[in-house]
């Protein structure tokens, strides 16, 4: 067999098998996605098929840009590096600029409005604490589990269980005290809502800059936070347009667990206030 000399004392067989390229490794995943897209298009609806592609796009944006909501706040607190939080501010600003006009002019789109409540404050604190411990929010846990990270693969079923249990007891939590939901678009119109949102984001950016000592600057930010924000804003807007509701992850986790509990005969959704609602 002929050999090729690559360096003194080192040779490689000319016919040696090369390591598969990244594209070759991704080909089976692409084939599965394409097959699932075709099945949804044929058996379910074009809407669900398109939402599959939107979900793939969101997952790709999160993984390729390593765009983490949990990570952004952690590096701000631990290292006083505001890049991740600034990336999230860019994402929210872009998405607000696209989604608020849609919510105002397309009646088939609906905002995810919930009542400000004691349960919201308690839940936000517990969720924020746990996502730092688990190294991921809902979307982060899902895409890291998809990448094969053992920690997140173990957390995923527990996340689903927790979401399900929270939905089952939702009415009891709301009974602790809640106000009426407030929709900025309904209250101020698309323009007023957008201006209010951008102003609030600007205040957050200023406060973060003062605390970290690094003012907001696109030139100083790592590129992945910028283009990741653009990609996620694009696909989140497409999700709103196609699904008629905002991008949400945690509801899906609870739905998986609810379906599993129902299939095992452990839960009757018709006897629960949340799951018996036609919207759920």
Regions from the language model: what does each represent?
Residues 1-280:
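Membrane-interfacial helix-loop segments of redox and metal-homeostasis proteins
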